[in-house]
């Protein structure tokens, strides 16, 4: 029999069992695609977490947090941003509207919240202005048969994501790749 490594818990969140380690993972998942209280539950659990991950969704959704810093409406930032010891991650499934994210981040910091530890997946896809335009055009085209879109570009965004024609964060740093991706997207959209 080979050597079995023994891992010990490095913090209050893990438990050593035998020769292995088990970490506590909490996942808050909504089944109704909407306002079920996921944000409130996440906010309560965030203060006892090491990492908070926003793994999907866009700026169309949001939740209100009331804490010692005041009252905040978060749309893209993970709920852990109010706690300095927490790593906050925006995952690859998020519809990343960079302008809205920066505005939300600045708003939180300007109100006295210490700059949060924020990490963005290089595989997060970027929301582009034409996603919002297409969403609005489609809702107008449907008229009374419209589905009640927030007109924030979510459906066209996820369409591009799953058709693999969108732009990921890692691609915006390479001018040639970005140019190719935009050219391909524009060609398909026209």
Where are these regions (language model features)?
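Non-transmembrane, aqueous-exposed alpha-helical and coiled segments at domain scale
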Residues: 23-190
């Amino acid at each position: 029999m080979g050597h079995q490594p023994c891992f010990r818990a490095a913090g209050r969140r893990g438990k050593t069992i035998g020769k292995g380690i088990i970490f506590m993972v909490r996942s808050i998942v909504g089944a109704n695609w909407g306002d079920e209280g996921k944000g409130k539950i996440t906010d309560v659990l965030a203060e006892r977490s090491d990492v908070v991950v926003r793994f999907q969704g866009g700026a169309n959704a949001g939740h209100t947090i009331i804490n010692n810093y005041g009252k905040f409406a978060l749309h893209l930032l993970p709920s852990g941003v109010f706690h300095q010891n927490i790593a906050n991650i925006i995952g690859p499934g998020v519809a990343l509207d960079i302008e809205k994210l920066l505005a939300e981040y600045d708003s939180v910091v300007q109100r006295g919240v210490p700059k949060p530890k924020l990490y963005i997946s290089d595989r997060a896809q970027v929301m582009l202005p034409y996603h919002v335009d297409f969403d609005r055009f489609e809702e107008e085209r449907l008229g009374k048969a419209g589905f009640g879109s927030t007109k924030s570009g979510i459906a066209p965004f996820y369409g591009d994501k799953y058709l693999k024609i969108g732009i990921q964060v890692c691609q915006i740093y390479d001018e040639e790749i970005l140019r190719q991706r935009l050219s391909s997207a524009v060609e398909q959209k026209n």
